[in-house]
């Protein structure tokens, strides 16, 4: 089981190389080595034991300290082995830290022991030195400054090990990383300022970063000088930086403050540069893109460098360095080629001139030409130089004095790639850009300013549809003052003065309006409050400064667009539509369609509650014909996946669809028509220029467009959390309030360049914020609607119930409760107005969800913490909760139970869904908490019941599933029931024998496992509160002992058993192996294996021992007319013993009334339904009521005698036909044969064989049929050809005006016919595929008709593997069989046509007659013969394959590698790639023999043939 690592501990970066070296040390004499996990375990264990040393970095000093402390510890008896492993692992790490390379763990421990001995000698020597020099202090501090006992200090150089340690961290994590800062802060506490700065300079790192660090140190020095004027006790910058001091002077105690200040400056500089490297706009992150010109790259780079708060020399260095290192490969090569060795010192202007043409087509062609130009002599170099800019020879383009010349328009000042004339030419292609939709009025480059008279003064106000209020900076005091007013915008909350009834005039229009006086406003604005009154409108789509990317859309291949006529509309609706369309045309959203655009889509309108009309478009046909686009956004963002942020802003994009232009070539398919009332004039046709509402691709095009527009802006602001779904935008950040609002303002300005606006009235600043149906708070989130409506007992329509359930499902991520009873209520009638009835159980279920929604609150995701998902069994569902801290869920959910899945499988399915949700919303893999025990889940996985487990999982106790655990594997006081079930003598049987003497057995269909469970079920039904059950089925035994939940059992037998078990006090379940001599088990096995008289159904009653027969019950009220016979099927199936037969007789009470039972012999072994034939001999109708005893079943012993020859002298008075009391039963079948013949008109032989009537009687039926006499077949049919299994003949025939394609199988005579449209090759090939799919033929005979000999037909026959031969058309010898079939088919068809409405039905009936009803001499139909042949082929193939698999061999066995004698021959039971399995006759064991010890021989029967 894997375990997920936590992010709280970032590992041991300082020991990365040490651990890598330690992993090469072998544990023992074998090849096994220490692993990284062993090392990490040892280090973390030590951190846990010695918490006071946990924060210190792992130096060799710390390791010796830990080693000394470990030696002083005494582990418990149970932990000694683990403690020894800890010491051994630490010894290996210490050796690797010191650069030693021991081969084994034992060698590492020896090295450390030897080092300890040397250290003890050194300490002893140190004691002698102390005696000689008592003033010398024994130091234990970090070098280089050493305190002496006499009070002085000495300096010692930085240890090389420490220096190497810092170098390693700087190389692996970076010079400005947190790891290097932490290491430096630890070691440098006792360093001199000079040591700190020298070590910093010698560290590996980016030169630009070092320059920035130096710049930050200079800034700190300047700030120190400003804040600390020179004085007697004030440190100077030179003292702090260690300038002009020796290390010995700097080590004195009075310089401690200077060293601390210097270290603080260095750490501050490291942090500042690190912050610069991670924020957007960092010059070192500004790199040239592949498609970006060098000039654009330099512009971005210089802008980023100028924004840096560093000194000018640093900026100059960054410009010179980064303009080369951050350039693209092509530009670097061009600069190397042009500037040579001075490329690093060259100015930015020189580099721009060198790279001016890099990336252009001319540059690429120039490189290609240079590559293909042959090498010339050195003396001619430069003679034919020509300027690419002006075209004159003698100099290059970079040396041209005429400046940049455009090669497209010829003007100076810009390059060809920036030429505006070139960009304006050409038609839009996919991926091209186009401007936002423009009105037919004036187009402005920015929001316009217009002159408005405010009071008595004329002012130029900015027209802004995003502003609610009209704002001016000053006012002449006219109007009515209304006090102070608070305004909220992107810049925050501001306060101004409100004035009403102010005189406003625009051109000739004058109104009384409201204004706000705000002296601090940078611009005066005309807001929406007065724009409408003055008749001023602004089309927001006209304000773009950049072009909106276009998305290509098109129709499906072969489609021509919708051509649906406009349906009539009322005068009222036409007027409403005209008003809407006129406004759309003025705003540039629709245009007049040209006459050759013929597509049309219907439009209509509805009136809203406000009384305004709303235009609707029926785009269904256009949507069908339009190619789909990929789904841009696969789901709704969830607040549980958001991170907690200090500030949030919710924005709404106004007129989102109507701002984005529709792909121009597609616009012709969006035309619609405005009708003219009473046809008084021509109709006006329009088309859409923008994304219309209701068109299926509008959402996708909008999402792709916004993705392209916002991609760059989002990349430039990685510090914010940005989300967008359709026109709703979420922005969250941990920045300061002003900086956060500045970013929002920047976004508004950015998308305004494309024509999009963010209306002020829909902007939400701060918490609580409503977004996509959620309500966001600083520490939590919930749904906007916190409550669900109440439901009460009583009727409710399905429509209303579906809406209620839909509201609940939407809020499941905070409820997490299942509603199985309410969901079950929705089953049944699907009509929306059909009623359901709400009961108390539904109300309780609903109230539980309402209460949960009120109480639950969601939390935000913290990327620093692990995510957990806990699953548990709910009410017929799996409920799970996703959290990072207990009691603070991110979200919850429910997975309803799935049929035919076990409990474990359903929990794993829910775990998969949970994992998928977490990965989608947070990008992390969760830790799954499964209910139950780990060993149970591992067992489920090993048994194959589940095939997936989470990456990280563990178990918890889970909810209690059994209220009462009453099934145990121990003996309980009470009777014992021995149960058994299975297939006995080909019939399912089950039963039990109790220790009380009670017995029970019954026949029943089912599998062995089902019958075993049914036996236990019957025992549980009859058993007392305490009982024992003994079974020989391991399956049933394990089921009874499993910790099942009744709700998850899908097997109905198991569910019934569990229901019975719940009501028992205690049940002991025991298992015994079958057929092992256990008396009671063998007794029940014999008992249910006996063939016993068994019945199924309620149509028979038990009899007394003295009664002759069993009474049969009439199933329903039966009416028998006078003199009529009626067959009555009763509810009874019976299973007779092999030595029994039965007879159905008349009851004496019925015989007295003239009602008799006729016939009714039941043979031995009969298992079918019983039918009673009743004859009413009376002159009036007789009624037998339901439930009346009307016949009796008499059992008789079966007596069997062999028949002997009578003798030639014997004579019979019965006649040649043998008609007698038993032979006359066929008379009853004559009416049935006549009825069948009237349906299908089969011949006499078929009737004779099917109904068992004499041949003469069958011939009489045919002769008396008028239809058959009128349509007699010719008596003689000649002609024949090849016959064989799977060999067919085919030909066309005509019946009246219809063409029929006829196929006939030559062996069986099976016919297949189909009506076709014509005798074409295409039609024949289609029918051939149908014919082949049904019959799988091998060969086919046809004439030379054009449809049969076409090349495509021949290719099809080869493809299908059919051997196709052709003969001569109309030659009886080549097509005899199919020609005869034509006549038979048409003759039968003519008989059946009057009986059917459709010709195809009559043709199908003809095939039934000829293939199924027509019997041959042996009583078989063509269909019987065909099926028999196919089965024989299958059996032969199977037998052949089995024979091929049987092999025989001689073999020998080996003992200690020496081969023994050859044994055999014997049969090979199994053969593999390198060995076989045989059975040794002597030991009766199975042996695996390698192929080298085997000699294969032919089967024994082949040897006999020889």
Swiss-Prot record:
Keywords: Aspartyl protease, Capsid protein, DNA integration, DNA recombination, DNA-binding, Endonuclease, Hydrolase, Magnesium, Metal-binding, Multifunctional enzyme, Nuclease, Nucleotide metabolism, Nucleotidyltransferase, Protease, Repeat, RNA-directed DNA polymerase, Transferase, Viral genome integration, Virion, Virus entry into host cell, Zinc, Zinc-finger. Mg(2+) 1 binds at residues 652, 727-728. Residues 971-1093 form the RNase H type-1 domain. Residues 1447-1499 bind DNA. SMART domains: ZnF_C2HC (SM00343). Residues 587-776 form the Reverse transcriptase domain. Residues 1270-1430 form the Integrase catalytic domain. Its cofactor is Mg(2+). GO terms for cellular component: viral capsid. The RT polymerase active site binds 2 magnesium ions. The record marks 363-364 as: Cleavage. Zn(2+) binds at residues 1237, 1241, 1265, 1268. A zinc finger (CCHC-type) spans 385-402, 404-421. The reverse transcriptase is an error-prone enzyme that lacks a proof-reading function. High mutations rate is a direct consequence of this characteristic. RT also displays frequent template switching leading to high recombination rate. Recombination mostly occurs between homologous regions of the two copackaged RNA genomes. If these two RNA molecules derive from different viral strains, reverse transcription will give rise to highly recombinated proviral DNAs. This is Gag-Pol polyprotein. It comes from Maedi visna virus (strain 1514 / clone LV1-1KS2).
